[in-house]
Regions:
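Short cysteine/histidine-rich metal-coordination sites, predominantly Zn2+-binding motifs
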Residues: 65-73, 89-97
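Short beta-strand His + acidic residue motifs that chelate non-heme Fe in jelly-roll/DSBH
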Residues: 82-83, 91
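Short cysteine clusters
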Residues: 51, 75-78
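N-terminal pre-ligand scaffold of iron-sulfur
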Residues: 1-68, 83-84, 98-114
Length: 114
């Protein structure tokens, strides 16, 4: 789904603290899915909230995500660690796999699906 088809923003950029995560519901290929959003400065990256290891959600409670001392997103179920640059699993049971990216666009201080 493109931003033109979904004019409603997912979340305001300022609602995500710098270096923090947020959860948003997105529609991908016609399915409503949970996504994890990560803000770094003025950029926001997004991935589906699904670990490639066992298909479980990454958050330990709805919208609550773990970040390691090394600065990786950590799956609460089995401890897989994912790079916040590209979503690649850098440690854990699915090393070498990657999270499914969600294309985002920032406009007027809001985050939209791209």
């Amino acid at each position: 789904m493109s931003a033109a088809e979904s004019p409603s923003p997912l979340i305001a950029v300022d609602a995500i603290a710098d270096g923090a995560f947020a959860e948003a519901e997105v529609c991908v290929d016609g399915d409503h899915e949970s996504a994890v959003l990560y803000r770094q400065g003025e950029s926001v990256r997004g991935w589906l909230n699904i670990c490639p290891h066992a298909g479980r959600r990454l958050d330990w409670a709805p919208g609550q995500f773990l970040k390691s001392r090394e600065g990786h997103l950590v799956c609460a179920a089995h401890g897989a660690s994912f790079s916040l640059e590209d979503g690649e699993c850098v440690a854990g049971p699915c090393k070498g796999d990657a999270l499914r990216a969600v294309a985002l666009q920032l406009r007027d201080g809001q985050v939209y699906l791209a």
